[in-house]
Every structure is written in C-alpha cells, then in structure tokens.
Amino acid sequence: MANLCEICGKGNNSGASVSHSNKKTKRKWKGNIQKLKAMVDGRPKKVKVCTQCIKAGKIERAF
C-alpha cells in the first residue's frame, strides 16, 4: 500500500540536495501521512490521511 493521502493524493516528492559547491544528490520529501480511524460510508475504517486534510476537516474521525 502506497504512502499516499486517500483524500488529496499527496505523497512523496523527489528532487535534489544542492551543496554550496553546487553538487547535487537525489533526495525525497515525505508527506506527513497519518493512519487514523475515520467514518467511511457510515462505518469506521483505518485510512491514511495527510495532516493538511485532517486540519481542514475533510475527514470525519471515528472515536
């Protein structure tokens, strides 16, 4: 299962670290993905959601 937000699709981004001498090495930026229980179709289900979607209230949490 991929490390993606099930609401907005946010995941990992790739790019380069650039040193002072302008050497470049590949690196990744990881999205802040959390596992939580949410109400999906009226039932609690474990989903992976990014923190921006949690803060924006795009998911109804199941307690």
Curated annotation (Swiss-Prot):
Region (Disordered): 11-30
SUPFAM superfamilies, A to Z: L28p-like (SSF143800)
GO cellular component: ribonucleoprotein complex; ribosome
A GO MF term: structural constituent of ribosome
Entry keyword Transmembrane: no
Pfam families: Ribosomal_L28
InterPro entries to which the protein is assigned, alphabetical: Bacterial_rp_bL28 (IPR050096), Ribosomal_bL28 (IPR026569), Ribosomal_bL28/bL31-like_sf (IPR034704), Ribosomal_bL28_bact-type (IPR001383), Ribosomal_bL28_sf (IPR037147)
Alphabetical UniProt keywords: Ribonucleoprotein, Ribosomal protein
GO terms (BP aspect): translation
Polar residues biased stretches: 11-20
Residue spans of biased composition, Basic residues class: 21-30
PANTHER family per record: 50S RIBOSOMAL PROTEIN L28, LARGE RIBOSOMAL SUBUNIT PROTEIN BL28A
UniProt similarity note: Belongs to the bacterial ribosomal protein bL28 family.
Protein name (database record): Large ribosomal subunit protein bL28
Organism: Natranaerobius thermophilus (strain ATCC BAA-1301 / DSM 18059 / JW/NM-WN-LF)
